[in-house]
Regions:
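Histone-fold recognition with a strong bias for associated Lys/Arg-rich disordered tails
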Residues: 1-161
Length: 161
């Protein structure tokens, strides 16, 4: 299902699964994806994994510059973490379904990859597809000047270089 995804995009989805399981959710949703995107974007995967109880060596992702300003990323993450009730964590080994919203976002990211003729789906494709949604975390990003058009410009720049 994720053959056309970059290593970084797969890491985002892995982080989304860990975040969802940590809060005891029944399925992965937009907040989990947004959390995974921000953690990966800000290059804080090792500390997030430690917070989520994952031990061992982390195989790092390719070097990249953060797309989001650090203060914006921190504020959105804090709001997401505060807005969800916590219940019994779901074991890492348990498969979790994805919400229909998240399924639509993944499909939109794949379509965007084709439309832009990108080699693979990257975290920026996922960000762009996410920006089409009506959601408090997305609105917080818009309020800071992050737009779908801006993300698409960043994808085009990434594809060139």
């Amino acid at each position: 299902m994720f053959d056309g995804y970059s290593i970084r995009a797969k890491q985002v989805l892995f982080l989304a699964r860990l975040e969802s399981g940590a809060r005891g959710a029944e399925m992965l949703d937009l907040d989990d994806l947004l959390t995974g995107l921000i953690i990966e974007d800000q290059n804080v995967i090792p500390s997030a994994l430690a917070r989520l109880g994952m031990e061992g060596q982390f195989m790092g992702s390719p070097e990249h510059h953060a797309f989001l300003p650090a203060d914006t990323a921190t504020n959105v993450l804090e709001n997401i973490h505060q807005s969800h009730p916590r219940s019994q964590p779901i074991p890492h080994s348990t498969d979790m379904p994805i919400s229909s919203d998240l399924g639509e976002i993944l499909a939109a990211a794949s379509e965007l990859r084709k439309e832009l003729q990108s080699k693979e789906v990257t975290p920026l494709h996922l960000f762009a597809a996410t920006m089409r949604r009506s959601h408090s975390g997305i609105q917080a990003l818009r309020n800071k000047g992050i737009t779908e058009e801006g993300v698409i410009r960043a994808i085009r720049k990434e594809d060139l270089g």
